[in-house]
Amino acid sequence: MIHKNWAELIKPTQLVVKPGADPARVATVIAEPLERGFGLTLGNALRRVLLSSLQGAAITSVQIDNVLHEFSSVAGVREDVTDIVLNLKGVSIKMEVEGPKRLSISAKGPGVVTAGDISESNGIEILNKDHVICHLDEGADVFMELTVNTGKGYVAADKNRPEDAPIGLIPIDAIYSPVKKVSYEVTPTREGQVLDYDKLTMRIETDGGLTPDDAVAYAARILQDQLSIFVNFEEPESATRHDVEDGLEFNPLLLKKVDELELSVRSANCLKNDNIVYIGDLIQKTEAEMLRTPNFGRKSLNEIKEVLSGMGLHLGMDVEDWPPENIEDLAKRFEDQF
Protein backbone atom coordinates (compact mmCIF):
# COMPACT_ATOMS: atom_id res chain seq x y z
CA MET A 1 0.00 0.00 0.00
CA ILE A 2 2.81 2.44 0.81
CA HIS A 3 4.12 2.55 -2.75
CA LYS A 4 0.76 3.81 -4.01
CA ASN A 5 1.60 7.20 -2.49
CA TRP A 6 3.99 7.82 -5.38
CA ALA A 7 3.39 5.01 -7.87
CA GLU A 8 -0.18 6.08 -8.63
CA LEU A 9 0.64 9.75 -9.20
CA ILE A 10 0.89 10.72 -12.83
CA LYS A 11 4.42 11.51 -13.95
CA PRO A 12 5.49 13.80 -16.79
CA THR A 13 6.02 11.82 -19.97
CA GLN A 14 7.03 14.73 -22.19
CA LEU A 15 9.95 17.10 -21.74
CA VAL A 16 10.22 19.51 -24.67
CA VAL A 17 13.05 22.02 -25.11
CA LYS A 18 12.29 24.86 -27.53
CA PRO A 19 15.48 26.80 -28.37
CA GLY A 20 15.31 30.59 -28.47
CA ALA A 21 17.06 32.98 -30.87
CA ASP A 22 20.38 32.02 -29.25
CA PRO A 23 20.01 28.30 -28.36
CA ALA A 24 23.12 28.31 -26.15
CA ARG A 25 21.61 31.01 -23.94
CA VAL A 26 17.82 31.05 -24.26
CA ALA A 27 15.25 28.25 -24.31
CA THR A 28 11.77 27.29 -23.17
CA VAL A 29 11.45 23.99 -21.30
CA ILE A 30 8.01 22.36 -21.10
CA ALA A 31 7.09 19.40 -18.87
CA GLU A 32 3.69 17.69 -18.88
CA PRO A 33 1.48 16.20 -17.56
CA LEU A 34 1.87 16.89 -13.85
CA GLU A 35 -0.52 16.27 -11.00
CA ARG A 36 -2.55 19.36 -10.19
CA GLY A 37 -0.49 21.68 -7.99
CA PHE A 38 2.82 20.08 -8.92
CA GLY A 39 3.44 22.63 -11.67
CA LEU A 40 3.63 25.42 -9.10
CA THR A 41 5.57 23.29 -6.60
CA LEU A 42 8.22 22.18 -9.08
CA GLY A 43 8.35 25.45 -11.00
CA ASN A 44 9.04 27.51 -7.89
CA ALA A 45 11.61 25.06 -6.50
CA LEU A 46 13.48 24.77 -9.80
CA ARG A 47 13.48 28.54 -10.31
CA ARG A 48 15.02 29.20 -6.88
CA VAL A 49 17.72 26.57 -7.39
CA LEU A 50 18.48 27.76 -10.93
CA LEU A 51 19.09 31.31 -9.74
CA SER A 52 20.96 30.55 -6.52
CA SER A 53 22.75 27.22 -6.55
CA LEU A 54 24.44 26.50 -9.87
CA GLN A 55 28.21 26.83 -10.14
CA GLY A 56 29.63 29.59 -12.33
CA ALA A 57 32.62 31.91 -12.66
CA ALA A 58 33.19 35.62 -12.07
CA ILE A 59 35.85 38.30 -11.64
CA THR A 60 36.49 38.72 -7.90
CA SER A 61 39.12 41.48 -7.85
CA VAL A 62 41.11 43.86 -10.04
CA GLN A 63 44.42 45.65 -9.68
CA ILE A 64 45.10 48.59 -12.03
CA ASP A 65 48.56 50.08 -12.47
CA ASN A 66 48.99 53.39 -10.60
CA VAL A 67 45.57 53.07 -8.90
CA LEU A 68 45.34 52.81 -5.11
CA HIS A 69 41.58 52.59 -4.58
CA GLU A 70 38.27 52.43 -6.45
CA PHE A 71 37.57 56.18 -6.06
CA SER A 72 40.56 57.07 -8.23
CA SER A 73 40.71 58.01 -11.90
CA VAL A 74 43.09 56.75 -14.56
CA ALA A 75 44.91 59.13 -16.88
CA GLY A 76 43.49 58.96 -20.39
CA VAL A 77 40.53 56.77 -19.41
CA ARG A 78 37.08 58.33 -19.71
CA GLU A 79 35.51 56.17 -17.02
CA ASP A 80 36.56 56.45 -13.40
CA VAL A 81 37.59 53.31 -11.52
CA THR A 82 34.13 52.85 -9.99
CA ASP A 83 32.61 52.58 -13.48
CA ILE A 84 35.36 50.22 -14.62
CA VAL A 85 34.64 47.94 -11.65
CA LEU A 86 30.93 48.04 -12.46
CA ASN A 87 31.65 47.05 -16.06
CA LEU A 88 33.92 44.20 -14.96
CA LYS A 89 30.99 42.73 -13.02
CA GLY A 90 29.21 42.28 -16.35
CA VAL A 91 31.92 40.09 -17.90
CA SER A 92 30.64 36.52 -18.41
CA ILE A 93 33.22 33.79 -17.89
CA LYS A 94 33.24 30.03 -18.29
CA MET A 95 35.82 28.15 -16.22
CA GLU A 96 36.56 24.45 -16.53
CA VAL A 97 39.46 24.59 -14.08
CA GLU A 98 39.63 25.20 -10.35
CA GLY A 99 40.26 28.80 -9.31
CA PRO A 100 41.38 31.32 -8.42
CA LYS A 101 43.23 32.23 -11.62
CA ARG A 102 44.87 35.43 -12.85
CA LEU A 103 44.05 37.15 -16.16
CA SER A 104 45.13 40.51 -17.48
CA ILE A 105 44.25 43.40 -19.80
CA SER A 106 46.91 45.46 -21.54
CA ALA A 107 45.68 48.22 -23.88
CA LYS A 108 46.74 51.53 -25.39
CA GLY A 109 44.57 54.37 -26.65
CA PRO A 110 42.79 55.59 -28.48
CA GLY A 111 40.14 52.88 -28.53
CA VAL A 112 37.59 50.82 -26.66
CA VAL A 113 38.62 48.15 -24.17
CA THR A 114 36.23 45.19 -24.25
CA ALA A 115 36.02 41.81 -22.55
CA GLY A 116 37.64 40.38 -25.67
CA ASP A 117 40.87 42.13 -24.65
CA ILE A 118 41.15 39.97 -21.53
CA SER A 119 43.92 37.41 -21.87
CA GLU A 120 42.52 33.88 -21.80
CA SER A 121 44.22 30.76 -20.50
CA ASN A 122 43.53 27.03 -20.74
CA GLY A 123 40.12 26.15 -19.34
CA ILE A 124 38.92 29.77 -19.19
CA GLU A 125 36.70 31.38 -21.83
CA ILE A 126 35.30 34.91 -22.05
CA LEU A 127 31.71 34.57 -23.28
CA ASN A 128 30.66 38.17 -24.02
CA LYS A 129 33.73 39.51 -25.80
CA ASP A 130 31.90 42.65 -27.03
CA HIS A 131 31.10 43.82 -23.48
CA VAL A 132 32.63 47.30 -22.99
CA ILE A 133 34.94 47.84 -20.02
CA CYS A 134 36.27 51.36 -20.69
CA HIS A 135 37.23 53.93 -23.35
CA LEU A 136 40.80 55.14 -23.85
CA ASP A 137 41.89 58.52 -25.20
CA GLU A 138 45.02 59.21 -27.24
CA GLY A 139 48.17 58.34 -25.30
CA ALA A 140 46.40 56.28 -22.63
CA ASP A 141 48.19 53.13 -21.46
CA VAL A 142 46.33 50.74 -19.16
CA PHE A 143 47.27 47.47 -17.50
CA MET A 144 44.85 45.55 -15.26
CA GLU A 145 45.33 42.26 -13.46
CA LEU A 146 42.11 40.35 -12.81
CA THR A 147 41.39 37.50 -10.41
CA VAL A 148 38.69 35.04 -11.50
CA ASN A 149 37.19 32.26 -9.44
CA THR A 150 34.33 29.77 -9.38
CA GLY A 151 31.44 29.68 -6.93
CA LYS A 152 27.67 29.95 -6.63
CA GLY A 153 25.18 32.70 -6.02
CA TYR A 154 26.26 36.19 -4.98
CA VAL A 155 29.37 36.99 -2.92
CA ALA A 156 29.88 40.57 -1.68
CA ALA A 157 33.11 42.41 -2.46
CA ASP A 158 34.32 42.45 1.17
CA LYS A 159 34.32 38.62 1.12
CA ASN A 160 36.60 38.66 -1.92
CA ARG A 161 39.44 40.58 -0.27
CA PRO A 162 42.27 38.23 0.77
CA GLU A 163 43.83 38.82 4.19
CA ASP A 164 47.19 39.45 2.54
CA ALA A 165 45.74 41.69 -0.20
CA PRO A 166 48.35 44.10 -1.62
CA ILE A 167 47.75 47.85 -1.72
CA GLY A 168 45.70 48.73 -4.76
CA LEU A 169 43.76 45.46 -5.00
CA ILE A 170 40.07 46.27 -5.46
CA PRO A 171 37.61 43.48 -4.55
CA ILE A 172 34.51 43.11 -6.73
CA ASP A 173 31.02 41.77 -6.01
CA ALA A 174 30.91 38.33 -7.65
CA ILE A 175 27.73 37.15 -9.35
CA TYR A 176 28.59 33.53 -10.07
CA SER A 177 25.23 32.25 -11.28
CA PRO A 178 25.31 31.28 -14.97
CA VAL A 179 21.52 31.68 -15.05
CA LYS A 180 20.40 35.26 -15.61
CA LYS A 181 16.61 35.02 -15.86
CA VAL A 182 14.00 32.38 -15.07
CA SER A 183 10.24 32.65 -15.35
CA TYR A 184 7.61 29.94 -15.34
CA GLU A 185 3.95 29.51 -16.15
CA VAL A 186 1.51 26.76 -15.16
CA THR A 187 -1.42 26.00 -17.46
CA PRO A 188 -3.99 23.17 -17.66
CA THR A 189 -3.22 20.20 -19.90
CA ARG A 190 -4.97 17.02 -20.99
CA GLU A 191 -4.04 13.41 -20.32
CA GLY A 192 -6.45 11.12 -22.12
CA GLN A 193 -9.92 12.45 -21.36
CA VAL A 194 -8.85 14.21 -18.17
CA LEU A 195 -8.04 17.94 -18.35
CA ASP A 196 -7.26 18.36 -14.65
CA TYR A 197 -3.46 18.26 -14.96
CA ASP A 198 -0.67 20.87 -15.03
CA LYS A 199 1.73 21.87 -17.79
CA LEU A 200 4.89 23.60 -16.58
CA THR A 201 6.53 26.04 -19.00
CA MET A 202 9.88 27.52 -17.95
CA ARG A 203 11.72 30.27 -19.85
CA ILE A 204 15.41 30.32 -19.04
CA GLU A 205 18.23 32.66 -20.03
CA THR A 206 21.87 31.90 -19.20
CA ASP A 207 25.17 33.67 -19.85
CA GLY A 208 26.15 31.02 -22.39
CA GLY A 209 28.41 29.09 -20.04
CA LEU A 210 25.61 26.58 -19.56
CA THR A 211 22.75 25.68 -21.89
CA PRO A 212 19.23 26.20 -20.48
CA ASP A 213 18.31 22.50 -20.67
CA ASP A 214 21.52 21.52 -18.86
CA ALA A 215 20.79 24.17 -16.23
CA VAL A 216 17.37 22.61 -15.55
CA ALA A 217 18.92 19.14 -15.39
CA TYR A 218 21.52 20.26 -12.83
CA ALA A 219 18.89 22.08 -10.75
CA ALA A 220 16.69 18.96 -10.71
CA ARG A 221 19.68 16.86 -9.67
CA ILE A 222 20.38 19.24 -6.78
CA LEU A 223 16.78 18.95 -5.57
CA GLN A 224 16.89 15.17 -5.93
CA ASP A 225 20.05 15.01 -3.85
CA GLN A 226 18.75 17.35 -1.15
CA LEU A 227 15.43 15.49 -0.79
CA SER A 228 16.90 11.99 -0.61
CA ILE A 229 17.65 12.30 3.13
CA PHE A 230 13.91 12.59 3.88
CA VAL A 231 13.18 9.11 2.46
CA ASN A 232 13.47 6.98 5.61
CA PHE A 233 12.34 3.60 4.24
CA GLU A 234 13.27 0.96 1.70
CA GLU A 235 11.13 0.42 -1.38
CA PRO A 236 8.48 -2.08 -0.27
CA GLU A 237 7.42 -3.22 -3.72
CA SER A 238 8.68 -6.55 -4.92
CA ALA A 239 8.85 -8.06 -8.37
CA THR A 240 8.37 -11.52 -6.81
CA ARG A 241 5.75 -13.79 -8.31
CA HIS A 242 5.09 -17.20 -6.76
CA ASP A 243 4.38 -19.32 -9.81
CA VAL A 244 4.08 -22.97 -8.87
CA GLU A 245 3.68 -24.06 -12.47
CA ASP A 246 6.95 -22.43 -13.54
CA GLY A 247 8.74 -23.33 -10.35
CA LEU A 248 10.00 -19.73 -10.04
CA GLU A 249 9.77 -17.27 -7.20
CA PHE A 250 9.82 -14.30 -9.59
CA ASN A 251 8.49 -13.07 -12.91
CA PRO A 252 10.20 -14.99 -15.77
CA LEU A 253 10.55 -11.70 -17.68
CA LEU A 254 13.37 -10.82 -15.31
CA LEU A 255 15.46 -13.53 -17.02
CA LYS A 256 15.32 -11.69 -20.33
CA LYS A 257 18.58 -10.04 -21.33
CA VAL A 258 18.60 -6.26 -21.67
CA ASP A 259 20.25 -6.46 -25.10
CA GLU A 260 16.95 -7.89 -26.38
CA LEU A 261 15.00 -4.75 -25.41
CA GLU A 262 15.71 -2.89 -28.68
CA LEU A 263 17.18 0.11 -26.88
CA SER A 264 19.20 2.84 -28.56
CA VAL A 265 22.91 2.12 -29.00
CA ARG A 266 23.80 4.73 -26.36
CA SER A 267 21.45 3.26 -23.73
CA ALA A 268 22.51 -0.31 -24.50
CA ASN A 269 26.20 0.57 -24.21
CA CYS A 270 25.64 2.32 -20.87
CA LEU A 271 23.91 -0.78 -19.46
CA LYS A 272 26.67 -3.01 -20.81
CA ASN A 273 29.38 -0.84 -19.28
CA ASP A 274 27.56 -0.99 -15.93
CA ASN A 275 27.43 -4.82 -16.09
CA ILE A 276 23.64 -4.90 -16.30
CA VAL A 277 22.85 -8.12 -18.18
CA TYR A 278 19.30 -9.15 -17.25
CA ILE A 279 16.08 -7.19 -16.71
CA GLY A 280 16.24 -8.45 -13.14
CA ASP A 281 19.53 -6.57 -12.74
CA LEU A 282 18.07 -3.43 -14.31
CA ILE A 283 14.84 -3.02 -12.34
CA GLN A 284 16.67 -3.09 -9.00
CA LYS A 285 18.51 0.08 -9.97
CA THR A 286 16.99 3.39 -8.84
CA GLU A 287 16.71 6.40 -11.13
CA ALA A 288 19.43 8.13 -9.11
CA GLU A 289 21.79 5.17 -9.54
CA MET A 290 21.15 5.07 -13.28
CA LEU A 291 21.85 8.78 -13.69
CA ARG A 292 25.21 8.28 -11.99
CA THR A 293 26.20 5.84 -14.75
CA PRO A 294 28.82 7.45 -17.07
CA ASN A 295 27.31 8.93 -20.28
CA PHE A 296 23.79 8.00 -19.12
CA GLY A 297 21.40 10.94 -19.38
CA ARG A 298 17.75 11.83 -18.96
CA LYS A 299 16.89 10.77 -22.52
CA SER A 300 18.24 7.26 -21.95
CA LEU A 301 16.48 7.08 -18.59
CA ASN A 302 13.10 7.97 -20.12
CA GLU A 303 13.63 5.41 -22.88
CA ILE A 304 14.29 2.62 -20.38
CA LYS A 305 11.39 3.64 -18.13
CA GLU A 306 9.03 3.52 -21.12
CA VAL A 307 10.21 0.04 -22.14
CA LEU A 308 9.90 -1.31 -18.59
CA SER A 309 6.47 0.28 -18.17
CA GLY A 310 5.23 -1.66 -21.20
CA MET A 311 6.26 -4.85 -19.39
CA GLY A 312 4.55 -3.87 -16.14
CA LEU A 313 7.89 -3.15 -14.48
CA HIS A 314 9.81 -0.09 -13.32
CA LEU A 315 13.10 0.96 -11.79
CA GLY A 316 13.60 0.66 -8.03
CA MET A 317 11.86 -2.72 -7.60
CA ASP A 318 13.04 -5.35 -5.14
CA VAL A 319 13.67 -8.96 -6.19
CA GLU A 320 14.36 -11.43 -3.42
CA ASP A 321 17.30 -13.82 -3.87
CA TRP A 322 18.41 -12.26 -7.13
CA PRO A 323 20.33 -13.38 -9.08
CA PRO A 324 19.54 -17.12 -8.84
CA GLU A 325 22.55 -19.44 -8.90
CA ASN A 326 21.47 -21.14 -12.13
CA ILE A 327 20.43 -17.96 -13.92
CA GLU A 328 21.83 -18.95 -17.32
CA ASP A 329 20.01 -22.30 -17.29
CA LEU A 330 16.78 -20.60 -16.22
CA ALA A 331 17.13 -17.98 -18.96
CA LYS A 332 17.43 -20.72 -21.61
CA ARG A 333 14.48 -22.59 -20.11
CA PHE A 334 12.13 -19.62 -20.33
CA GLU A 335 13.45 -17.92 -23.47
CA ASP A 336 10.47 -19.16 -25.50
CA GLN A 337 8.17 -17.08 -23.25
CA PHE A 338 9.94 -13.88 -24.29
UniProtKB/Swiss-Prot annotation:
A Pfam family that the UniProt record links to this protein: RNA_pol_L
Keyword annotations: DNA-directed RNA polymerase, Nucleotidyltransferase, Transcription, Transferase
Region (Alpha N-terminal domain (alpha-NTD)): 1-234
Name of the top EC class for this enzyme: transferase
Region feature (Alpha C-terminal domain (alpha-CTD)): 250-338
SUPFAM superfamilies reported in the protein's UniProt record: C-terminal domain of RNA polymerase alpha subunit, Insert subdomain of RNA polymerase alpha subunit, RBP11-like subunits of RNA polymerase
GO biological process: DNA-templated transcription
Entries under InterPro entries matching the protein: DNA-dir_RNA_pol_insert (IPR011262), DNA-dir_RNA_pol_RpoA/D/Rpb3 (IPR011263), DNA-dir_RpoA (IPR011773), RBP11-like (IPR036603), RNAP_asu_C (IPR011260), RNApol_insert_sf (IPR036643)
EC number(s) per entry: 2.7.7.6
GO MF: DNA binding; DNA-directed RNA polymerase activity; protein dimerization activity
Matches recorded under SMART domains: RPOLD
GO cellular component: cytoplasm; DNA-directed RNA polymerase complex
Reactions accelerated catalytically: RNA(n) + a ribonucleoside 5'-triphosphate = RNA(n+1) + diphosphate
HAMAP family (alphabetical): RNApol_bact_RpoA
Domain notes per entry: The N-terminal domain is essential for RNAP assembly and basal transcription, whereas the C-terminal domain is involved in interaction with transcriptional regulators and with upstream promoter elements.
NCBIfam families: PRK05182.1-2, PRK05182.2-5, rpoA
Function: DNA-dependent RNA polymerase catalyzes the transcription of DNA into RNA using the four ribonucleoside triphosphates as substrates.
Subunit-level organization: Homodimer. The RNAP catalytic core consists of 2 alpha, 1 beta, 1 beta' and 1 omega subunit. When a sigma factor is associated with the core the holoenzyme is formed, which can initiate transcription.
Name of the protein: DNA-directed RNA polymerase subunit alpha
Gene (name only): rpoA
